[in-house]
Amino acid sequence: GVTKASVSKWETKQSLPDILLLPVLASYYGVTVDELLGYKPQLGKEQIQKIYHDLAAEFAEKPFEEVMDASRKLVKKYYSCYSFLLQISILWLNHYTFAEDPKSQMGILDETVELCTHIIENCKDISICNDATVLKAIMDLQRGRPQEALDLVEDMLSPYRLASQSSGILIQAYQMVGDMDKAVSYTQISMFLHLLSLVEGATQYIAFRAQDKESCEETIRRMDGLIELFQLERLHQNIAAVYHYQVAVYQCQQEDIEGVFARLKRFVEIICDLLDHEAALHGDGYFNRLEEWFEGLDLGKQMVRDKKLVLDNACQALENPVFSPLIEDKRLVRLKRVLTEKRETL
């Protein structure tokens, strides 16, 4: 029932085919309706990376809601591309604090939870579902719902599970089949991740054990040695900066003012060093087999936030109420000025 004249009008866009004809036409040409319309519901890894980093850059330059609306439209367009939705969830989690008020921030967290729930309920890829579950738990913590977070991940992330103790199995298997290249690479990756995890864990430990001075002081002593030994201030500036900042908070609670400014000075120096360079994940002379792994990460090795937003966060960190007794101290004023001047150069 399709005439040449009808097809000619479709080709010249004078008219469109009846929607009921689309399945018939698709069957005739041996393609799906999506293929017939030129609709591609799935994105490749490089496409996802580009969209993520483009949106992250726009968050630093454009009105927040304008970028959020653009990302929401992309979510609707690629609602069945679960790897993309996972990265949008990460994007929203990394930027929701820049919404104009707490109510708006909470609304974005709620949207992100809904997106993660959609992934978990519909995606067939277990690894993507597990990542979405962990993200959902993080959002629950941010929303003040710790019990819901526990219900989601307590069993999955339990240290009693064999999966949490099995990093050496893959390394040993590669070694036994003679693939020493992968064995060495995976060993370095495992060591690198455990190093970061140890410092992150110590940072959290200092935060909630501030009343136990002896334990905190010993933790700081050990972590300072570890950070220097592995040159972490150059290897992973973000982890090192967060550690020094948390120690500064602890020392302010202990009224060790000289210690506070020594740590805040390191915090500011590391942030500035991070922004002066490429600001990408990297190895060093010891961890020299990580590059391929970094390149293979879902978002590549680039920062998950734009440099300007990283600097804005650092400026906000110095406004922490814990430092209010020092607000007129020239040293704090100077550190704030350093970050402000750095912001003007970006």
Model-identified regions with their sequence ranges:
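Alpha-helical segment of the N-proximal tetratricopeptide repeat
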Residues: 46-80, 87, 94-103
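Alpha-helical protein-protein interaction modules
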Residues: 198-329, 333-334, 338-346
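Recognition helix of helix-turn-helix/homeodomain-like DNA-binding domains
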Residues: 1-16, 38-42
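Residue at a conserved register position within TPR or TPR-like alpha-solenoid repeats
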Residues: 58, 92, 99, 133, ...
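Generic helix N-cap/helix-start motif at coil->alpha-helix transitions
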Residues: 45-52, 78-85, 96, 124-133, ...
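DNA major-groove recognition helix of helix-turn-helix/homeodomain DNA-binding modules
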Residues: 20-35
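Solenoid-like repeat scaffolds
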Residues: 41-42, 72-79, 117-125, 153-162, ...
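Helix-turn-helix repeat elements of alpha-solenoid scaffolds
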Residues: 57-72, 102-117, 138-153, 172-184, ...
